[in-house]
Amino acid sequence: MVDPVAALCNYNVLEVIFSYLELDDLSHCSQVCKSWYHFLNDENSDVWRWHCLNKLPKESLKSDLLSSVPTYKTKLRAYFHAWSPNDCSRNVYIKPNGFTLHRNPVAQSTDAARGKIGFRHGRHTWEVIWEGPLGTVAVIGISTKEAALQCHGYVALLGSDDQSWGWNLVENHLLHNGDMQGSYPLLNNAPKYQVGERIRVILDCEDNTLSFEKNYEFLGVAFRGLPDKKLYPTVSAVYGNTEVSMVYLGTPLDG
């Protein structure tokens, strides 16, 4: 019979030790034994709470931005998948909350940003929230590392080459390799995007498809035949002082 006092002591000791480990080390620890796996599988445990409070900006934890990732562990994961300050146009900066990009008001420029982590395997979904005016062109989608992040003029940069795929929210057009691939979604009088709406981007690296959801409604497959390359969440914008947030959600739920 297990002494409950001893069990509690072991739990508290593990909690303290795990709180001081790096996140990569926690991943390895979860594979040591079933006990440690179940301990770390509690996504709202004090261990994940401690790491969350110490790594995430307080501004993001106090906002509604992370409402779709309710546990401490999923908030941490979203933070490490957010926009990359090192992989964006020179006219873009990432705000202190870590999840929102701001495009500076630079004339005759189109500017883009990619997420920190790209995907080549599995199924992934993330939310994009355009929190400022769209302007004449506002594109969300994916790109490889080879796709350009800045160009002259006000154009649909994302989707302008063979390394990027995008949905222009202003005109409801799909874009790839510089061509308009058709209207999207395939609805009569499809409603235009409203600032502040959350769009879910669904990347399936097994079926090589990209799809979108809006207001929890699946809009259909937008692109098929995606290449076997690492693909990154990406947006491109033209409007000065507009802001776009991205929150990684993990594996999409079917149904």
Curated annotation (Swiss-Prot):
One Gene Ontology CC term in the entry: neuromuscular junction
Would you tell me the protein name for this molecule? F-box/SPRY domain-containing protein 1
Organism lineage reads as:
Eukaryota, Metazoa, Ecdysozoa, Arthropoda, Hexapoda
> Where does the record place the F-box domain?
3-51
GO biological process per UniProt? negative regulation of gene expression; negative regulation of synaptic assembly at neuromuscular junction; neuromuscular synaptic transmission; positive regulation of protein catabolic process; proteasome-mediated ubiquitin-dependent protein catabolic process; protein ubiquitination; synapse assembly involved in innervation
Keyword presence, Hydrolase: no
Which terms are listed as keywords in the entry? Neurogenesis, Synapse, Ubl conjugation pathway
The similarity annotation says: Belongs to the FBXO45/Fsn family.
User: How is the quaternary structure described?
Assistant: Component of an E3 ubiquitin ligase complex composed of hiw and Fsn.
PANTHER family in the cross-refs: F-BOX_SPRY DOMAIN-CONTAINING PROTEIN 1, SPRY DOMAIN CONTAINING SOCS BOX PROTEIN
Q: What gene name is listed for this protein? A: Fsn
